[in-house]
Amino acid sequence: MIEADRLISADIQQPEEEIIDRAIRPKLLAEYVGQPQVREQMEIFIQAAKLRHDALDHLLIFGPPGLGKTTLANIIANEMGVNLRTTSGPVLEKAGDLAAMLTNLEPHDVLFIDEIHRLSPVVEEILYPAMEDYQLDIMIGEGPAARSIKIDLPPFTLVGATTRAGSLTSPLRDRFGIVQRLEFYNVDDLQHIVARSASFMGLEITAEGARQIAMRSRGTPRITNRLLRRVRDFAQVKGNGEIDEDIASKALDMLNVDAAGFDYLDRKLLFAIIDKFMGGPVGLDNLAAAIGEERETIEDVLEPYLIQQGFIQRTPRGRVATNHAYRHFNRIMEAP
């Protein structure tokens, strides 16, 4: 099963979706919905850097996928009035790949590295002096004739994004002056995002219809916008084009997204714990084998929301389905 196949995947799926997402993506902090603590702190840090005519300190953003890490990087570049250069950890295979990007930066530019936890050790070593001293150490030649030269870099801001902050090496993590964690969004903020996106897309939507979509979006704006597009299709074919509570509810039910935002893969995971393993505890490897998924998919994609909403617990002995999960599926939790 590929994560991108899921309707409620937090990954970008189609080029059309990416184009729409870029169009409706907020450009400034004033337009940024949710994450009030992050927004307030970044506003202060950005203003202070601009007053000093300095580059913003290096920033690490972590949290589950789809919560706006790339959006925040774009906003920072816009607020600072500088260019944004974008790449990702897996793309930077050799030290020369990173060196080429660094030497093309203008003063105070933002370099955004997505999936920064996947940088190779060789590339990471190049990054240390670049972050600390704005210098690039390059080896010229090989063997006894090899020598190191230093290239000065303009002051820049590195923005690293990751879903797995614990996978970063300590030396890399310690070089970020600002660390921000993005949390799952509440329903009110997601409803605001639905209404804003619908306005950009020229859709008529009621407050109740927007809330129905928000409630089933797993706290994730990217999923919110994806569900909105699918509900739009349903409203245009089965209704008069307007999205009200009834249309939204029927569309999402047809798409097998339930009231908690679960799809078949979430239910498969929870039913495996409840039925196959008697509610748990069950080890991650056994659980992955039982549902035919990679353990990384469970850890990075499924579990964060289920744990945050109180449907499963991680224990030293494995994963356990909570009373909340049993109630959601109208099951009775047997006494141990």
Curated annotation (Swiss-Prot):
<dbReference type="InterPro" id="IPR008823">
    <property type="entry name" value="RuvB_C"/>
</dbReference>
<keyword id="KW-0547">Nucleotide-binding</keyword>
<dbReference type="GO" id="GO:0000400">
    <property type="term" value="F:four-way junction DNA binding"/>
</dbReference>
<keyword id="KW-0238">DNA-binding</keyword>
<feature type="region of interest" description="Head domain (RuvB-H)">
    <location>
        <begin position="259"/>
        <end position="336"/>
    </location>
</feature>
<dbReference type="GO" id="GO:0016887">
    <property type="term" value="F:ATP hydrolysis activity"/>
</dbReference>
<feature type="binding site">
    <location>
        <position position="69"/>
    </location>
    <ligand>
        <name>ATP</name>
    </ligand>
</feature>
<feature type="binding site">
    <location>
        <position position="175"/>
    </location>
    <ligand>
        <name>ATP</name>
    </ligand>
</feature>
<keyword id="KW-0067">ATP-binding</keyword>
<keyword id="KW-0378">Hydrolase</keyword>
<feature type="binding site">
    <location>
        <position position="66"/>
    </location>
    <ligand>
        <name>ATP</name>
    </ligand>
</feature>
<dbReference type="GO" id="GO:0048476">
    <property type="term" value="C:Holliday junction resolvase complex"/>
</dbReference>
<protein>
    <recommendedName>
        <fullName>Holliday junction branch migration complex subunit RuvB</fullName>
        <ecNumber>3.6.4.-</ecNumber>
    </recommendedName>
</protein>
<dbReference type="InterPro" id="IPR036390">
    <property type="entry name" value="WH_DNA-bd_sf"/>
</dbReference>
<feature type="binding site">
    <location>
        <position position="295"/>
    </location>
    <ligand>
        <name>DNA</name>
    </ligand>
</feature>
<feature type="binding site">
    <location>
        <position position="24"/>
    </location>
    <ligand>
        <name>ATP</name>
    </ligand>
</feature>
<dbReference type="Pfam" id="PF05496">
    <property type="entry name" value="RuvB_N"/>
</dbReference>
<dbReference type="GO" id="GO:0005524">
    <property type="term" value="F:ATP binding"/>
</dbReference>
<dbReference type="InterPro" id="IPR004605">
    <property type="entry name" value="DNA_helicase_Holl-junc_RuvB"/>
</dbReference>
<feature type="binding site">
    <location>
        <position position="70"/>
    </location>
    <ligand>
        <name>Mg(2+)</name>
    </ligand>
</feature>
<dbReference type="Pfam" id="PF05491">
    <property type="entry name" value="RuvB_C"/>
</dbReference>
<dbReference type="GO" id="GO:0009378">
    <property type="term" value="F:four-way junction helicase activity"/>
</dbReference>
<keyword id="KW-0227">DNA damage</keyword>
<dbReference type="InterPro" id="IPR003593">
    <property type="entry name" value="AAA+_ATPase"/>
</dbReference>
<keyword id="KW-0963">Cytoplasm</keyword>
<dbReference type="InterPro" id="IPR041445">
    <property type="entry name" value="AAA_lid_4"/>
</dbReference>
<feature type="binding site">
    <location>
        <position position="222"/>
    </location>
    <ligand>
        <name>ATP</name>
    </ligand>
</feature>
<dbReference type="InterPro" id="IPR036388">
    <property type="entry name" value="WH-like_DNA-bd_sf"/>
</dbReference>
<feature type="region of interest" description="Small ATPAse domain (RuvB-S)">
    <location>
        <begin position="186"/>
        <end position="256"/>
    </location>
</feature>
<feature type="binding site">
    <location>
        <position position="71"/>
    </location>
    <ligand>
        <name>ATP</name>
    </ligand>
</feature>
<dbReference type="GO" id="GO:0006281">
    <property type="term" value="P:DNA repair"/>
</dbReference>
<dbReference type="InterPro" id="IPR027417">
    <property type="entry name" value="P-loop_NTPase"/>
</dbReference>
<feature type="binding site">
    <location>
        <position position="25"/>
    </location>
    <ligand>
        <name>ATP</name>
    </ligand>
</feature>
<comment type="subunit">
    <text>Homohexamer. Forms an RuvA(8)-RuvB(12)-Holliday junction (HJ) complex. HJ DNA is sandwiched between 2 RuvA tetramers; dsDNA enters through RuvA and exits via RuvB. An RuvB hexamer assembles on each DNA strand where it exits the tetramer. Each RuvB hexamer is contacted by two RuvA subunits (via domain III) on 2 adjacent RuvB subunits; this complex drives branch migration. In the full resolvosome a probable DNA-RuvA(4)-RuvB(12)-RuvC(2) complex forms which resolves the HJ.</text>
</comment>
<feature type="binding site">
    <location>
        <position position="314"/>
    </location>
    <ligand>
        <name>DNA</name>
    </ligand>
</feature>
<comment type="function">
    <text>The RuvA-RuvB-RuvC complex processes Holliday junction (HJ) DNA during genetic recombination and DNA repair, while the RuvA-RuvB complex plays an important role in the rescue of blocked DNA replication forks via replication fork reversal (RFR). RuvA specifically binds to HJ cruciform DNA, conferring on it an open structure. The RuvB hexamer acts as an ATP-dependent pump, pulling dsDNA into and through the RuvAB complex. RuvB forms 2 homohexamers on either side of HJ DNA bound by 1 or 2 RuvA tetramers; 4 subunits per hexamer contact DNA at a time.</text>
</comment>
<keyword id="KW-0233">DNA recombination</keyword>
<dbReference type="GO" id="GO:0006310">
    <property type="term" value="P:DNA recombination"/>
</dbReference>
<dbReference type="GO" id="GO:0005737">
    <property type="term" value="C:cytoplasm"/>
</dbReference>
<dbReference type="InterPro" id="IPR008824">
    <property type="entry name" value="RuvB-like_N"/>
</dbReference>
<feature type="binding site">
    <location>
        <position position="70"/>
    </location>
    <ligand>
        <name>ATP</name>
    </ligand>
</feature>
<keyword id="KW-0234">DNA repair</keyword>
